[in-house]
Curated annotation (Swiss-Prot):
Claim: Ribosomal protein is one of the keywords in the record: yes
Entry keyword annotation includes Ribosomal protein: yes
Organism expressing this protein natively: Exiguobacterium sp. (strain ATCC BAA-1283 / AT1b)
Recorded superkingdom: Bacteria
Complex formation: Part of the 50S ribosomal subunit. Contacts protein L32.
Family: Belongs to the bacterial ribosomal protein bL17 family.
Keywords attached to this entry: Ribonucleoprotein, Ribosomal protein
GO terms under biological process: translation
Any matching Pfam family: Ribosomal_L17
Descriptive protein name: Large ribosomal subunit protein bL17
Leader sequence residues: none
PROSITE patterns: RIBOSOMAL_L17
Length: 117
């Protein structure tokens, strides 16, 4: 499968996607560049699908990827399994939406908002 390198090494790219995925789960809406959003979409879709499965192995797989951050009184993993995943119980994929905002002022990079549907 093709992917974008995002100008980073593989470990930096993985760290970036972990951070963005955790932020998207916690906030349910983030603003980033178009390429980062396009790379983030399949990662988050897989995490939500694991959340829908809901068993112990799925929870451990998500825990190995998502950062240990608090989302209010819950952490990101709890929020994924208790709030986000049940919302999509009847939906077969397509959990995210990307909306274009326009070019960023400093460097002209195309900025988008990626959010959970």
């Amino acid at each position: 499968m093709a992917y974008s390198k995002l100008g980073r090494t593989s470990s930096q790219r993985k760290a970036l996607l972990r951070d963005l995925a955790t932020d998207l789960i916690i906030n349910e809406r983030i603003q980033t560049t178009e390429q980062k959003a396009k790379e983030l979409r399949p990662v988050v879709e897989k995490l939500i699908t694991l959340g829908k499965r809901g068993d112990l192995h799925a929870r451990r797989q998500v825990a190995s990827f998502v950062r240990k951050e608090n989302a209010g009184e819950k952490d990101a993993i709890q929020k994924l399994f208790e709030d986000v995943a049940p919302r999509y119980a009847e939906r077969q994929g397509g959990y995210t939406r990307i909306m274009k905002v326009g070019p960023r002022r400093g460097d002209g990079a195309e900025v988008v908002i990626i959010e959970l549907v």
